[in-house]
């Protein structure tokens, strides 16, 4: 580009010089023609010519060099006048051409100089940057760069309505399970995969486990500060802390021990382990153990057995894994979504998307064991509760409108979440009525989830 510019400037200068020379020569010729006053027709041996000279007598101008000879195409006076006009026109045109070339060259030079000034500034700035890079960096002056935008948002950054249109109305979108929000943008999955299930269980077993045993006998006392889920497996009687003994010999007694009314109200929520360790602990001892939801429905006489409950001193931190069995379907949908991307050739996929698909596959493989474990627990619970269904149909159903918020499940089908809400009106009712209107289990929801 610079070579073309230099060539244009050079040609412009040449044109200016040539036009200037033509202008000078044209002016000199016009001046010479104007200096000749008259032209006479002279007969020479070769023919007649118009001889123009400064002298009035043509015989005196034959030997002079400043004489003008013209061929008589027209009368001599007309030829002389026409020549003078042509020379003046040529002089004017040369002057105009010289002016145009000079202006064009000047504008081009100005444009070149204006474009070279930023280059000079950039060269000076680059030299200063080199000098700064040569210095020793100060940690206090370091400013961290702005992190790039997440590529997960471009992979799955549509609204929930659009998600349903893309995947289907009966599919749970993936961000509802492995979703996160970074600066108000819903991304595809968390940056780090969830921790392994075995590592979390081993850590919680060392820090947050505490067990207690219930002695055999007609009466059992429990701590008034915590709700205790009691159980009778084959035969025996069990009472609550109020001191009232059960006189029924054919019906079991499964109650939630309530604290004295003078004490403070119970905590609103008691959370057990998400994987229901009571069931796994009982499978090793070959002793059938029911969860709190199933124990409230049992109408058979069972023997008293030792039940180990694991409770945490503080609530567990939320982990990025599903909390209920109904989320297992979304895992299948996620596998289908990953399979769609894997159908494409690796050449068409960018490295970022390929790495994202591999991370999702690793997360799904790490959580398959956890979901199978939850399904096994639900199946075991269904087998235990199957014989007691005829007797449970005779129990009085609790109205959810009259006593809202008695049982809360964090998600539909959660096996290990039980909450007790303090109800002032229920405390003022007689205890017999409370026992008659005890809550029923959500085993139907669990069965539906398993199916």
Curated annotation (Swiss-Prot):
Residues 1-29 form the signal peptide. Residues 204-213 have a biased composition (Polar residues). Keywords: Cell membrane, Endosome, Isopeptide bond, Membrane, Phosphoprotein, Signal, Transmembrane, Transmembrane helix, Ubl conjugation. Residues 30-85 are lumenal. One of its GO terms (biological process) is negative adaptation of signaling pathway. One of its GO terms (molecular function) is ubiquitin ligase activator activity. The modification Phosphoserine is found at residue 275. GO terms for cellular component: early endosome membrane; late endosome membrane; plasma membrane; recycling endosome membrane. It is a single-pass type I membrane protein. There is a cross-link at residues 274, 365 (Glycyl lysine isopeptide (Lys-Gly) (interchain with G-Cter in ubiquitin)). Residues 204-224 are annotated as: Disordered. Interacts with ITCH; enhances the ubiquitination of CXCR4 by ITCH and the subsequent endocytosis and desensitization of the receptor. Interacts with EPN1. This is Endosomal transmembrane epsin interactor 1. It comes from Mus musculus (Mouse). The gene is Entrep1.
